[in-house]
């Protein structure tokens, strides 16, 4: 049954509905453009902070690297410290969420460990600048952001410890935690150290080597100390 004139007015005619659709599409485009600009600023921040250090990078530097003016950065972040916080919080959440997905894909602990190692290697080779920023500029975060990053990363470490405990049920959790941290050190430091010596690392060749070394360290049986 056709709608009455009153109902049509209430619901909006074809022209009104078309206008609403256009406004919604424009709003979506603006949101997408804003998010792309935000991501560009974070990418620029990772590169500049890694190269020069947090304290030597200005908002004008960040804006110029992302193609905007310094004051325009405030449309996306409260300030430079907020950029650093967003950068390290985002990557910490990505690590934890990615690790949880990896572990959920299999019930076999060795397969889960292999996937965790591959996941960490991909991260290290893909985002060496972020790792450098974390190591050098963590203290420049606000206390609130420091606490949240620590919590996220602690949960990520414990995810590894839980998988390792299934492979080494008789090994103390503290030792398993040490293995996990040592493995992160091995994996995370290699891309930056090779690049800093003037040689560009090829993920294609470095990835399998790092994965093999990490798995060997994680799966080795602990040697007993001599009496």
Give the role of each language-model region.
Residues 1-6, 23-26, 173-194, 205-217:
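Hydrophobic alpha-helical segments that form the core
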Residues 93-96, 143-168, 177-181, 205-208:
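Amphipathic alpha-helical packing segments from all-alpha helical-bundle domains
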């Amino acid at each position: 049954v056709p709608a009455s004139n009153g109902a049509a007015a209430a619901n909006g005619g074809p022209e009104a509905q078309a206008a609403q659709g256009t406004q919604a599409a424009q709003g979506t485009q603006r949101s997408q453009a804003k998010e792309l600009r935000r991501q560009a600023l974070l990418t620029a921040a990772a590169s500049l902070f890694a190269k020069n250090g947090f304290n030597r990078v200005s908002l004008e530097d960040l804006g110029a690297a992302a193609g905007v003016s310094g004051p325009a950065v405030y449309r996306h972040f409260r300030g430079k410290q907020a950029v650093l916080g967003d950068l390290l919080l985002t990557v910490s959440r990505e690590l934890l969420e990615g690790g949880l997905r990896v572990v959920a894909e299999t019930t076999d602990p060795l397969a889960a460990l292999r996937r965790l190692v591959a996941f960490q290697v991909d991260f290290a080779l893909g985002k060496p600048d972020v790792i450098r920023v974390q190591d050098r500029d963590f203290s420049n975060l606000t206390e609130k952001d420091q606490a949240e990053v620590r919590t996220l990363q602690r949960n990520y470490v414990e995810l590894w410890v839980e998988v390792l405990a299934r492979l080494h049920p008789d090994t103390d959790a503290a030792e398993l935690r040490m293995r996990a941290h040592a493995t992160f050190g091995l994996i995370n430091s290699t891309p930056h150290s090779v690049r800093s010596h003037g040689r560009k690392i090829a993920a294609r060749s470095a990835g399998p080597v790092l994965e093999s070394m990490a798995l060997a360290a994680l799966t080795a049986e602990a040697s007993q100390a001599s009496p």
